[in-house]
Amino acid sequence: MSSIARPPDPCLVAIILIVRSRAGPRFVFHYPPNPLSENGLRGAPKARRPSRKNSKSNESSSSEDSSSTSSEDEDEAPITATAAAPATTGTATQPANATQNASHVAGSHPVAGRRSSNFGVVDDTTISGSPGGESQRAGSVGSGRGLMMRKRGTNSDAEEDAGAASDRQEDEAGPFRPPWESLLGLPADVWEKLLSPSRSWHKRRFEVGINDLAFVGWPVFVREDGTWRKQRRKKRKPRATWEGGELGHNETPGDGDGDGEGDEAGTEDDSPDRGTELIAASTETLSPKQMATTDSQRASMISVRSFRTLSEALDPDDKDCMTMFNVVFVLDPPLLEYSMRLREIYDNIIKKFSKALKWEQARTDYVWKEAQHISHIKEKAKEKRMSVNSLYSELISQSSLARAICTVFTSISASKIASVSLSPDVSISLQIPPLTSTPWLPGPTDKAYPGLWLTTADSVTPVDDPTADENTAPHQVLAKHFALLLLDNEASILKDVEASGGALAPALAHYIRCSKPTKSFAQISVSSGIPLSTIQMLASHLVYWRRARAIPPLHQRDTYIVSPNCDLSKLEVATAAYQAAFPTLPSLPKMLSAMSGTPRPYGSFIPSKDHKDTYFAILAWLLRGGWVTQLRAFARVKISPEIKMAVETALRQEEVDKYLSKRGSASDTEIREDLDDASSSSSSSLGSNGSGDETPMPGRYKRNNELDLSHSLLDQNTSLKTSSLILYPHRASPLESRWLGEVMARFPELQGDVPDGDLEYAGLRTSLKKYWPTFIKYFNGYDALEKIPVRESLKRKLVWQILMRLGLVTGQQSSIQLDPREQILKTVQFFTKTIHNFEINKTISPNPASSHVMTPRHTDGRNGTTPTN
């Protein structure tokens, strides 16, 4: 039982494969065969959309305006910051010359925010793409929201489509029209023209909006020299095998295919440094073929490319050559989540799947061969008048591309990981990342995910990234201070790893056996001898495959409470599972009841040292199911009026001293200047016939040695009677830096030497001036104080003794004598709301008048506490 929430419904309706050859575009394959019918191979979802009715409308809405979609280059780096160059924005209309009405049966489950739709024949359809913008919801028929575009009278691709159109006319003249030659009530020739854009859409986000359906793809065109990948500019080691699971997951801004328009990359090869790529690649598959490149495969790659000479590629007599393919995903997202859902599936599924196909097309002409194979099977089925189910069973069994599209649709629709094998050398895994944690408790109008891990541990903080804010996405690379929590039984995970085989299997099995949720990656590296980079790569692999989660290492001095977001509906089932795992220990209700009391370190629940490992196993089990969460303390520096007044007094004294020093050094000079001025004035008055008035000049009579406090560091709007919070000590202003310096200056000197080996009370006998520069950067309200001992490699007892001296309120202070001069922390504990059938407790800490730092302790990361005077 794990606390990972399934991704939202991807709203996937169908997947379409369109190819274009010299003869024209072809509607090759779509899955499922009847997307909006419960009679198809795949039943319609039970909570998809309102039922559809038959429609006789010959109008359709346009898609969104030209700024509604975003276009990206092929080069991305999910591990590092993505910097895709903006491409040009364009809007074009495609014809939809169809006159028959469409009717279909839809799923029977409405979803809030969805519109009912009459999906019919389209007259006007807008294809839009905007590299920098977000998609907006396309308007429905007659809604007035969509930008209605003029229907194009002539087909720009008329010459290319002539051959295909004539072939279709022969088919239509026959008495039998196969059901697989239409989709959503429209004939195949409509979709061929609509979803076959011009070359300007090469490797850009292609989006068509028809009623409330969105058609999104990433078209790929052949290069002008007839190849699918740009030749190398620099002589590098050839790479002929698939090395990265999902292309794009491994790429960096400097890497790419270098294909024609829209590409910034000048070379075909990725960076020679494969360290980062190996980490990303490991998250995709355990196939050993991804880990090495054989000489025969390299030779095959070179021979394939050398075979495709320019003369052969551009041979005008060769009519059987593919020039474009486009895998189009048909989506039906909710109205209010249109942009978000399209962005998720485009970035994580559409683009990466198309890149994988492009790779194989460049290597072995894969897409074109499979398209011809599928078309051949369909022609035979048409002659035999096979049923749709029989045809699709044969296609999926005989065509690897049809099987791959089927796998992607089935897995992504079920919010699972799609593991696709295009060939023995190329495999890819695709998924929409699931929700693993949340830093917020849901509000009354928010969608709740009961059982989801409630924490801020995986959020980017100012210590991690000084330029980050609270809305920054979590880090992509696992930090060395994290630990790994398996989301399933270790034995079952090891069994799956060993059964999967592959080059990573032995390393994964060894790491899983060495890993403990109480030890960080860095500690495991030291104890096991596994390099830290390898551990991070293996941990990323397990996290990607939803078999583990990165957490702060479990420790007995940390405080854990019952999560306010725990799923009580699963309590009965969880109790039985807990009893089976820990039959001789306190039951699950008893453990939750004990942990729902006054928050205290987890070590206080452990009866003896012999039970330590067992109770940590219990804690890991509770965290895995989202039953408990860590109570973390956060702090901000509070500057009292006394500190402000002391700093202001010092600043004014500095101004006075500066004034006096200038005046003393200039006194002799002023006397000489006065004598010279008197003599020159008398002589000039004798020889002048003017009025004797001097020309007024700005600042002429202002002496340099006059006392001027206009440049004081003190902001005139700052009140000296109220306290202030320093939000970001690492970016403190000059005045805030003076305040922090004054706080440190007021700490008493060293209280006494600590005997060698006596670390029991080291934190109580050490001068705070020694640790203040280290601790101050964590007092920003975003970094938990529990990070300090882990990140700074300090003993936890030492850290918490220092924090208690600073004013952090804990339950262990009764026997400790605190110096009032060191009490610069003001602590506040939020109400700890526990599960309903146990109890609700609250702890209110003292509010010392001399406090300077506020430290709220909570689980959801919100610092909504204002200190009082």
From Swiss-Prot:
Family: Belongs to the NPR3 family.
Protein name: Nitrogen permease regulator 3
Species: Aspergillus niger (strain ATCC MYA-4892 / CBS 513.88 / FGSC A1513)
Disulfide cysteine pairs (residue numbers): none
Function recorded in the entry: Mediates inactivation of the TORC1 complex in response to amino acid starvation. Required for meiotic nuclear division.
Compositional bias (Basic residues): 45-55, 229-239
Span list, region Disordered: 31-180, 228-275, 662-702, 842-869
GO cellular component, one term: GATOR1 complex
PANTHER family referenced in this protein's UniProt entry, alphabetically: CGTHBA PROTEIN -14 GENE PROTEIN (PTHR13153), GATOR COMPLEX PROTEIN NPRL3 (PTHR13153:SF5)
Endpoints of the signal sequence: 1-23
Biased composition (Acidic residues): 254-271
Composition-biased stretches (Low complexity): 57-70, 80-102, 679-692
Bias kind Polar residues: ranges: 115-129, 842-853
Record keywords, A-Z: Meiosis, Signal
GO biological process, one term: TORC1 signaling
One Pfam family, short name: HTH_NPRL3
